[in-house]
Amino acid sequence: MAEFTPITIAYGDGIGPEIMEAVLYILRKAEARIRLETIEVGEKLYKKHYTSGISEESWESIQRTGIILKAPITTPQGGGYKSLNVTIRKTLQLFANIRPAVSLHPFTRTLHPNLNLTIIRENEEDLYAGIEYRQTHNMYESMKLISHTGCEKIIRYAFEYAVKNNRKKVMCLSKDNIMKFSDGVLHKVFNEIAKEYPQINNAHYIIDIGTARLATKPEIFDVIVTSNLYGDIISDVAAEISGSVGLAGSANIGQHYAMFEAVHGSAPDIAGKDIANPSGLLNAAIMMLVHIGQGDIATLIENAWKKTIEDGVHTADIYNEQSSSKKVGTKEFAEEVTKRLGQLPTKLPKADYPLIAEKQESNIDYKIDTKEVKKLVGTDIFVNMNVSSAHDIADKINKLDLGNFELKTISSKGLKLWPRDTRFETVSDHWCCRFMNKDGTEIKHLDITRLLEALSTANIDFIKVENLFEFDGVAGYSLAQGE
């Protein structure tokens, strides 16, 4: 008797329930060997004051099954609510987001008939961590966190993906000409790991020109690996230029769990109208079937879906009077796909997936390298002061007993404003005061607390402390513009 794989199903918000019903209908007709557990997440939970959008009972289901098929959810805009997508990815350590984009030319409109690429997006770090602060009346902060181990995991995954899927080239996109530490480590690790895969070509693009090339010459790309926010943006670009963002599915892969979802959002403006394209979620379900070792069902469904597209049976988002034969709604599209189960596409590439379940490599032990000698050499103390000039701040601070420190610079938004010509000023209430060790004196954490006490006594409102370190004598901090 065939073994049925337990799957957690989340219907989501907006168009989520109707496209999920369409996909489940196809899965049933294709006789997918799955057993469903349904959970409630998203907007309904937010309204019940679950700020994360998910309940403990839902987590228990996910822990039991290890696999989630999730329709889009609506995250309320503004403060007070965290993105459920990000919460699930981070909690389950789903470090890799795989987003294929393939042209269906000539059956859908696209300027790029040869587009066939996959974006591998880091899924746990970067600005997407959502660590934010309001520090003054005027200034807001969002932290960009990138780890060496996180870069190792996603870049190695990208090269392994290329090997397993007969891809020829992996390209890394970053902005390390500006963010030399956070984006710099991504590029550095990419270059190191690329040497282990001599059979795979590799290249690096700065994210801005890389995105421009992706939009105009996507055929030069094969596998793209990048950080979280960049990956989110460029995968939507790739999906849109392939024909429609409504076609793209994605997989979120970790060591022990996996989540599959459409790339697009919940589209509440068209919810309940039976016009949404279920193809994105269907393609996510196909990726799920491959992942759990049901390549036969994945092959059956994908070929039927492609035959439906070839026959010109299209939802409104890809319907074209010149090339489409029939405009259908969400439910009817699903019915048309099931009518073609067992049929093969004649022009689009035929699917043929293996029956072996995908497993993550478990023999790589990612450890934090602590060999470099770490030395405390200074501290950046951010202060909230409403003054017209950085020189006013310097005058006030330099009257204090700074102990083993000396005030080296004052900057705002990364621009050095003291010591500097007073003609160069800015409107700000958020200032970074850089204190360095005086005459090579050894600094201890107690020295910093004494410095903070001196600032507090002088009624200087300090709002953040960033200590400055050297690693094997190399500065682990950036300089301000003009420093």
From Swiss-Prot:
Show the GO MF annotations.
Answer: isocitrate dehydrogenase (NAD+) activity; isocitrate dehydrogenase (NADP+) activity; magnesium ion binding; NAD binding
Q: Give me the residues that bind NADP(+), please.
A: 74, 264-270, 277
Database matches in InterPro entries: IsoCit/isopropylmalate_DH_CS (IPR019818), Isocitrate_DH_bac-typ (IPR014273), Isocitrate_DH_TT1725_C (IPR040978), Isocitrate_DH_TT1725_C_sf (IPR046997), IsoPropMal-DH-like_dom (IPR024084)
Q: Which cofactor does it need?
A: Mg(2+); Mn(2+)
**PROSITE patterns xref list:** IDH_IMDH
Enzyme Commission number: 1.1.1.42
GO terms under biological process? glyoxylate cycle; isocitrate metabolic process; tricarboxylic acid cycle
According to the record, cofactor stoichiometry and binding are noted as:
Binds 1 Mg(2+) or Mn(2+) ion per subunit.
Q: What's the superkingdom here? A: Bacteria
Q: Which reaction does it catalyse?
A: D-threo-isocitrate + NADP(+) = 2-oxoglutarate + CO2 + NADPH
| Site (described: Critical for catalysis) | 128, 175
UniProt subunit comment: Homodimer.
Tell me the function of this protein.
Catalyzes the oxidative decarboxylation of isocitrate to 2-oxoglutarate and carbon dioxide with the concomitant reduction of NADP(+).
What is the protein name given in its UniProt record?
Isocitrate dehydrogenase [NADP]
Q: Which source organism does the UniProt entry give? A: Rickettsia conorii (strain ATCC VR-613 / Malish 7)
Q: Provide the taxonomic classification.
A: Bacteria, Pseudomonadati, Pseudomonadota, Alphaproteobacteria, Rickettsiales
